[in-house]
Amino acid sequence: MINAAQNVLSDENNQIGLIYRAQSPYQMAWREWSDIPTVDKRNGVFSDYGVLELIDELKDSKVIINNSNYYIEPTRAFVAIDVNTGGDMSFAAGLKANLAMAKDLPRQLRLRGLGGQVVIDPAPMSRQNRKTLENAIKSSLRRDTIETNFVGWTSMGLIELQRARIRPNWLTL
């Protein structure tokens, strides 16, 4: 095939023509795309690439980020998220934990297939930092592929989100 193409290119009259016609699109695809990517068919590929560990992490409601963690608990009415700072109870640690959660939250909700009303109980922080956290959450939600609206703050200091339900919760499958 390559020799035929080189002969056509070296032709002096430079007329455009058909080199070889395929009998079907299937045969043409095999001829044109003969470099087949290798497929790993070994047993245990999921464990080799860490997929099983990621699935185990999704089964647990606890998500560990930096020196803090947060819990994602789906209920019948809404998805509850509780952010914790660990041992450090300072407002700075609370803000740091909340910002880390804001960055990771869309990914966790997407992987778990969670949607509907989402209520976040942020770690303790000063009222002046609410706008910072709100902007961080909105920024990370804008980068997500699933439509999520920041509804606002409740009088109790909780954050409300409304997220589109794209697929069922993966734990119910």
For each predicted feature, which ranges?
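Extended, charged alpha/beta regions that create polyanion-binding interfaces
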Residues: 1-77
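Conserved glycine-centered short motifs in functionally critical loops
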Residues: 65-173
